[in-house]
Amino acid sequence: MTERPEQIQSRLAGLDQIGQVTSALNAIASGQSAAARGALPAISAHAATVADALAVAAALAGAGPGGGEGPGLLLIVGAAQGFSGAYPARLAEAARAALTPGTAVLAVGGRTLAALADKGVAVLWSAEQAPLPEAVPDLASRITDAILDLVGTHPGPIRALTGAADPGGAPEIATIFPPEVAPARGALPDLTLPPAELLQGLLSEALFAAVARTLMQGLAAEAQARMQAMANARNNLRERRAKMQAAWQQARQEQMTTEMIELASARPDAAAQD
């Protein structure tokens, strides 16, 4: 049964409303992506400063960052919200493939946490992703504290997995601890702290910087995934609207034809009555 033009017009209005929602979500995601990417250089600069200080502290202490033997920890920074397409599932699959027996998992992002559960990945510690770049330092501090609490019972390297820095790229995994310590440059300074104590504090700060960078990159990657999902949704809406517009025109033409036939068939009766 062909729908009436009024019914199709109502459905067209509904599609237009959905289009407005997707446009708003895309605008928000675009702003988040730009803000997160804009914050990355500052985090990298902080990490570089810590690395320079770490080189000096290691030289004075006569020791490196160390790190126990074992499977270690895996930090997964994923998606907090929906409307991000297959991004949470891709991260969960990459995490499952990267796991080794005994690895403890820390996960950030509710959507990715659910995807990890679907893949059968057990999570030891979890948190929601920062909603804005401004909230990343506080979350990075919490995660750093959680990692430091767990390294005693889960020795080994600490790796981080999140979305690619480049849009559309595969998830990226990297070892964030222990850091690589470069040789110290220039004369070594005098210290007021014991070198070993300074080294330990700088190692914690290096871990914090690496976690913050991973969180910020994950925030940008999630926003980029949402932008791609909204672009796909807009393309789908355009196709559906074009088909529905054609259906409306056909229904309207059929309605007009029916009205003309009814008018034409009514004239002889009117003439006979005269």
Predicted ranges, named:
Residues 1-274:
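N-terminal assembly/interaction segments in proteins that build large macromolecular machines
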